[in-house]
């Protein structure tokens, strides 16, 4: 789903809004399908872009933002996040935990839930 990122590089706010609306509709289809088969989803991103289209002076920003990105767990099974924030290296151990698979000691990230 690169559309919000790619459109964010253009600096066009209107195009970014449309891209996010399309992305939202696509994600809804995936979520509905996964939940229908009792699956789980971890939804996140590696960086922002369309979330910060202008700087404080009103100039167009076309670079990736350094804002924190959400990590959303979607499932019929409740889980508890054990940290308020994390890093990209934490996503793989968290996925393995959800899949009930062992987390290799070589992984440097932490599981973000219990």
Identify the function of each model-found stretch.
Residues 1-114:
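Feature captures the catalytic ectodomains and active-site-proximal regions of enzymes
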């Amino acid at each position: 789903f690169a559309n919000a990122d790619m459109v964010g590089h253009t600096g066009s706010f209107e195009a970014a809004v449309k891209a996010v609306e399309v992305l939202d509709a696509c994600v809804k289809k995936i979520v509905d399908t996964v939940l229908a088969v009792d699956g789980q989803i971890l939804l996140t991103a590696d960086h922002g872009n369309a979330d910060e289209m202008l700087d404080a002076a009103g100039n167009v920003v076309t670079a990736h933002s350094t804002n924190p990105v959400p990590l959303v767990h979607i499932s019929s099974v409740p889980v508890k996040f054990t940290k308020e924030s994390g890093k990209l290296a934490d996503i793989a151990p968290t996925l393995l935990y959800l899949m009930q698979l062992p987390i290799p000691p070589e992984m440097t990230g932490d599981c973000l839930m219990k």
